[in-house]
Regions:
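Alpha-to-beta junction loops
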Residues: 1-4, 59-61, 103-112, 125-128, ...
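Hinge/capping helix and adjacent helix->loop/strand transition within the periplasmic-binding protein
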Residues: 12-97, 147, 161-193
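Extracellular/periplasmic bilobal clamshell ligand-binding domains
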Residues: 205-224
């Protein structure tokens, strides 16, 4: 068994090793990282209303984030609010780099996961302005409203964390291990893990795991 995330999948597909999700047996998806949009604590964008006002005024807004899932969910956000021409998306190698650029005033907004940004929110350097999730995050990220609260459709693209096995594993064994991992997610220790690393619960059964991993692969390959 091997821990396997959507980021691992993208790295694998970008490499020259020639492997795809089809070479493995997806077992379970356990949890997910979701994203928020952050602004400087005392910057011009204190809320989504400030972002919308800048768009309505014809301003260009510079946003930083990574090339993978953060860009995917940001594109969904832009499409939902109908403002494709209002943003310049600047690529960074990591969330830490884009957060640093935000604090330095090089960009107006940045994408980021709870784990990557929480320390900077607690220190008062940045603030969350939009939660790209179906519900608000826990404190100290809870001041950011969801898109649904703002009057739009929910926007989210969870970066899943899961488990895979060799492609030769039998169907019976795959079902067994999915059940084992489901039991893990029902323990207090697992809830403590989610809380520690600011992850969202996102357990998927065997069929859903296969579907999600395959679709993530197909979508990523189509975007290249």
């Amino acid at each position: 068994l091997l821990c396997f995330s959507s980021g691992d999948m993208q790295n694998m597909l970008d490499s020259e090793i020639g492997l795809t999700v089809d070479d493995f047996a997806p077992i379970a998806i356990m949890a997910a990282d979701k994203q928020l949009i952050f602004a400087q604590k005392d910057g011009k964008f204190a809320s989504f209303d400030d972002i919308k006002a800048a768009i309505d005024n014809g301003e260009k807004i510079n946003v930083g984030g990574t090339k993978s899932n953060e860009k995917t969910v940001f594109d969904m956000f832009v499409e939902e609010i109908g403002a494709a021409d209002s943003f310049n998306y600047m690529f960074y190698d990591s969330s830490a780099e884009s957060i640093t650029a935000l604090m330095g005033g090089h960009i107006d907004l940045c994408m980021g996961s709870p784990a990557a940004a929480v320390n900077y929110v607690e220190s008062g350097d940045i603030k969350p302005v939009v939660a790209l999730s179906d519900e608000r995050f826990n404190a100290p990220l809870d001041e950011a409203p969801t898109m649904e609260e703002l009057g739009y459709n929910t926007v989210q693209s969870p970066m899943w964390r899961g488990v895979i096995a060799p492609g030769s594993m039998s169907e019976e064994a795959q079902e067994y291990w999915n059940g084992v991992f489901k039991a893990v997610t029902e323990t207090d220790a697992w809830q403590d893990y989610l809380n520690t690393y600011l992850l969202s619960p996102y357990f998927q059964d065997l069929d859903s795991t296969r579907e999600i991993m395959k679709k993530a692969q197909d979508d990523y390959l189509a975007s290249k």
